[in-house]
Amino acid sequence: MKLSVQKIQLTLAISFLTLINLTLLSYTQVQAQLGNSKGQLNQSLIFAAPPPPPDIGEPGKRAEAGSRGCGGDMNKPLTSSQKRLTALVPVYSKSELVFAATTAEYPSFSFYVPYSSDFAYGEFVLEDEAQNQTIYKTSLAGAPGVVNLRLPSKAAPLEIGKRYRWYFNIYCKKDNQIIADVEGYVRREQLNSALKSQLEKATPNQRVSLYAANGIWYEALRAASELRRTNGQDTSWAALLQTVGLNDFATEPKVECCNLESQQ
């Protein structure tokens, strides 16, 4: 009788240990699947560019093509970087149109700036469809890197359905001449209720993917930038830039500057 009880106890102990091992194995598999899902989300991230407006005459310019001197010295380099001033925005390959959408009243515009504040300063210009311009001046950082220029909340907000043209010019401090410039277009879109509901329930990584899949570039880039700031191991920033051919800038540091000051 005692032997039977011992056998039952042994059987129960083995069953209990087996259950624990299966539970741990299952948990490990789920964790691995979640990890793979996050990695797959970034690797398969797709930016679905909206149809380009048919009535734009000048396509814009995403990157500065050449190098211009400062203060009359055409051979003086302003930076040791080999990269040029570049707007971190999509460009349509067939038309070379620089155009992207936002849902924000006051979006942020991101640029790679290879110049330092020792030599140069910046000017950001926003022009509406009636060609009314708002001109902002900004200082630059002390070193090359990615800068974010956010429209100040005291300015007139972007209107839904309206298209705006923007210019970002870099001036030489010595002679106040433009040494580099980029330009493009932005249109503010209405955020539909279905997407808004999805975004409210989404994780930070999923928000990047949702914005990108719906062609909302500026918010996708801002969400990816925030992930990069809070988690240096996250790959959303690099993956998003790669979708529009800007992977060369994925590892460039973000530099803290710059405030836009209205000149009007």
Q: For the regions a protein language model found, what residue spans apply to each?
A:
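C-terminal segment of classical bacterial N-terminal signal peptides
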Residues: L19-Q29
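Extended, polar beta-sheet/loop recognition surfaces of beta-rich domains
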Residues: L41-G57, K61-G71, K76, K94, ...
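Bacterial N-terminal signal peptides that target proteins for export
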Residues: K2-F16
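Solvent-exposed loop/turn segments flanking beta-strands in beta-repeat/beta-sandwich domains
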Residues: P114-F124, D128-A130
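Contiguous beta-strand segments within globular domains
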Residues: E96-Y112, S117
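Extracytoplasmic/surface-exposed domains of secreted proteins
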Residues: F109-F111, V146-K174, I178-A180, G184
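Solvent-exposed serine/threonine-rich low-complexity stretches and specific carbohydrate-binding patches
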Residues: Q133-G145
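Preference for solvent-exposed, low-hydrophobicity sequence contexts
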Residues: S236-Q264
